[in-house]
Amino acid sequence: MERLLSTREVAELLNIHEKMVYTLVAEKGLPATKITGKWLFPRYLVEQWVENNTINFPERIRPLTANQRLIVLAGSNDILLDQTITLYNRSFPGHLAVFGNLGSTGGVQALRNNLCHIASSHLIQDDESDYNFQFAASECEQMPVLVNFARRQQGLLVRRDNPLSIFSVADLGKPGLRLVNRSLGTGTRLLLDRELDKAGLRGDRITGYDHEVARHMDVGLEILAGRADVGPAIEAVAGALDLGFVPLRWERFDLLVSREVFFEEPIQSFFGLLQSDPFRAMARALPGYDVSQAGKIVFPENR
């Protein structure tokens, strides 16, 4: 079960008076449940609520049309995705793909607001049985098409010789350990918070829990520079920076696209690259990727 916060703990987390917490529940939709007369708050839902209410998107743009040559991707960052965008721009002169690093939650919200054509996301669902569908259904008026990009290995980055003997999330409770974390709204942060809950650890008691960086590579660079001992990131970063890696789980990383633009030529050209030899070669050169299902439409596990 996810860790539940008390009213006092939520007030401390949000830096507000306890009475204001009840106002937020009644008027602003702060996620809460009442058990035996006592209000309790799932921490990860509170964090999502904060993220949803602090991102201010500009006015909507029109979805991609057939005479446009621009693809805007937004959401979770990924090393292989960066390389794929470069491959697209090189393969289709006169077309341009660009990426906005908003985290998985921000990407789905950008798709909802027509601020991007493709959202990249790896948001694990409440029961951990699937990815992205639950969040897309709650954020988007119409369910987007989900296309698999890759399965990738998530875990903990450590120094090459792992001097602190970190072998699981439970080891993050060791005294003196310094964590570097990912930003709220990222799928990696959501995964880490879930794993901390399972291990019975509180993030606010871990040094560096609030030390947030925007990209997987930034986590590795903080460890490489000696400013942190451990942080959540994908295995490909460990390979790129010669760091140690503690695997946690394989996850599905999807690309979400609205049905209105799915069949547009630039979109189909981008997805077509996911089944090309150059794409597979790039994936083989990076540790921690499985692209056997890349480019295929994904359907919910429990239909």
Over which residues does each language-model region extend?
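A ligand-binding cleft/hinge motif common to bilobed small-molecule-binding domains
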Residues: H122-A136, G220-R249
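N-terminal hydrophobic or amphipathic helices and topogenic motifs
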Residues: M1-G106, R112-L115, S138-M143, V169, ...
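Short helix-initiation/N-cap motifs at beta->coil->alpha
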Residues: G100-Q109, D204-L221
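Periplasmic-binding protein-like
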Residues: R3, L146-Q153, G239, L243-G272, ...
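Flexible hinge/capping segments at coil-to-helix
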Residues: F149, V158-L179
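Ligand-binding cleft/hinge of the Venus flytrap
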Residues: I85-P93, A170, R182-L184, T188-H211
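Short beta-strand-centered segments that line the small-molecule binding cleft or hinge
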Residues: G107-Q153
